[in-house]
Amino acid sequence: MDLIDTHQHLILRDRVGYGWTADIPALATGDFTEADYAGLTAGKGVVGQVFMETGVDDADYQAEARLIAERVGTGGFLGQIASIRPETDAGFDAWLEEAQGLGTVGFRRILHVVPDDVSTTDRFRANLRKIGRAGYPFDLNFLSRQLIPVG
């Protein structure tokens, strides 16, 4: 059976920062490259992958998407889920527009690293609607305690 990996990560320290890895010994140093990924998936039926943004340092999230865009359409890269910051209007529209030309198939914001109320603002919700109107899904990444009980 042919498989598509819809959550591929790479760690490319020479291009972007990964501050969150500092306290995780197995991830604190070194890279996880396309060659590493290919070695792990060889013979496993993986015929393509969608890159999932890797929670890079805030200053690097756009650089990461631009870097991955160079790979989309090659070596099995089918697209990417790019990071976006719907909690701010500064540069939001410009990034949403640019990212559409970077092989982006969706967007994600890691919410468990920001204050819990970030996603409750009118600005956040308005910017999510912009993502939806542009035809893209938004991936929510949060801790269970951040999910408002339903029912």
What are these regions (language model features)?
Residues 61, 150-151:
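A short acidic (Asp/Glu
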Residues 16-18, 75, 150:
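Single-residue recognition of alpha-helix boundary sites
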Residues 1-70, 100:
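An N-terminally biased module of ancient metal coordination in phosphate/nucleic-acid-related enzymes
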Residues 29-38, 91-94, 147-150:
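Alpha-helical scaffolding within the catalytic cores
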Residues 62-146:
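Active-site gating/metal-coordination segments in enzymes
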